[in-house]
């Protein structure tokens, strides 16, 4: 799958950010602008170029299935699994795992180390340090202190 120029620019900006800075980037692409192909490209590169392990977090099973379908289309050679009660799958040993936050948020220490976590709909991460995403990300950083996190959203600001 060929990314559109603005999608490729977003992916390139993520790589530059991860290389040049220690904090975690947030990618803002409008609704229906193609966030999922960008995420799939990053997953593919993380596994094939950097031998990393990736977790993609989403909050509803429809997004999990959409991401799994796109990942298969973009990079069928990547070993990926799904961890979601709603989809009745609990894959844990894959290079890329697509997971529902409700199914996984108390299990960071049970899973093997991740090098990269991608959060779809990142605007759902609480600012106050509480909530499922914050709990999971804090626990995942205990497992791998060098963990990098990339957020994706169409709506980075809350009213």
Where are these regions (language model features)?
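Switch/connector loops and helix/strand junctions flanking conserved nucleotide-binding motifs
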Residues: 64-66, 91-92, 106-107, 126-127, ...
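Conserved SF1/SF2 helicase motif Ia
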Residues: 21-33, 37-67, 144
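Conserved pre-motif I regulatory segment
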Residues: 1-28
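Structural beta-sheet core signal
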Residues: 27, 56-57, 82, 149-151
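Conserved motor-coupling elements within RecA-like helicase/translocase cores
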Residues: 86-97
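Short basic/glycine-enriched coil/helix segment immediately N-terminal to the Walker B
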Residues: 20-22, 92-93, 106-116
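SF2 helicase catalytic motif II
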Residues: 101-102, 109-158
């Amino acid at each position: 799958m060929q990314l559109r120029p603005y999608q490729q620019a977003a992916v390139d900006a993520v790589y530059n950010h991860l290389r040049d800075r220690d904090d975690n980037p947030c990618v803002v692409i409008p609704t229906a602008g193609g966030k999922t192909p960008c995420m799939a490209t990053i997953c593919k590169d993380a596994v094939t170029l950097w031998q990393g392990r990736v977790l993609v977090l989403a909050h509803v099973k429809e997004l999990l299935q959409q991401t799994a379908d796109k990942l298969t289309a973009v990079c069928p050679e990547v070993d990926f699994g799904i961890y979601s009660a709603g989809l009745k799958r609990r894959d844990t040993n894959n290079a890329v795992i697509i997971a529902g936050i409700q199914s996984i948020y108390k299990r960071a220490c049970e899973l093997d180390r991740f090098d990269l976590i991608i959060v779809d709909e990142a605007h759902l991460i609480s600012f106050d340090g509480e909530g499922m995403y914050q709990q999971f990300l804090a626990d995942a950083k205990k497992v791998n202190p060098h963990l990098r996190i990339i957020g994706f959203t169409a709506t980075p600001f809350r009213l």
